[in-house]
């Protein structure tokens, strides 16, 4: 599949997902499953599940908020969004744990 065809297919999925098509949203999430795994790698099982769930919510919100008119490719946009979401999640988890220890 050419890069242009991939992006065109993805753009159509995003439009459908924004319109409420659950199958399109599931297809998008499946496409980005390797990214979810990469971001959760190295975490304990309990943390992994929490982070994975929060990243999925952020992904859904990100699809709805994405505006291709801004000229950003969706893969770049969603990678950045999920990366920073994970950073903030881990910071909150660490703060919560430090409060529990004290």
Feature annotation, model-predicted:
Residues 1-95:
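Alpha-helical promoter-recognition and RNA polymerase-docking modules of transcription initiation factors
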Residues 96-102:
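Internal acidic/polar
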């Amino acid at each position: 599949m050419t890069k242009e065809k991939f992006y065109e297919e993805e753009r159509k999925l995003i439009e459908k997902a924004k319109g409420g098509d659950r199958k399109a949203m599931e297809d998008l999430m499946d496409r980005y499953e390797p990214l979810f795994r990469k971001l959760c790698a190295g975490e304990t099982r309990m943390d992994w599940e929490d982070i994975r769930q929060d990243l999925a919510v952020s992904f859904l919100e990100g699809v709805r908020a994405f505006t291709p008119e801004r000229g950003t490719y969706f893969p770049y946009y969603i990678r950045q969004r999920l990366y920073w979401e994970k950073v903030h999640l881990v910071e909150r988890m660490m703060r919560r744990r430090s409060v529990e220890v004290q």
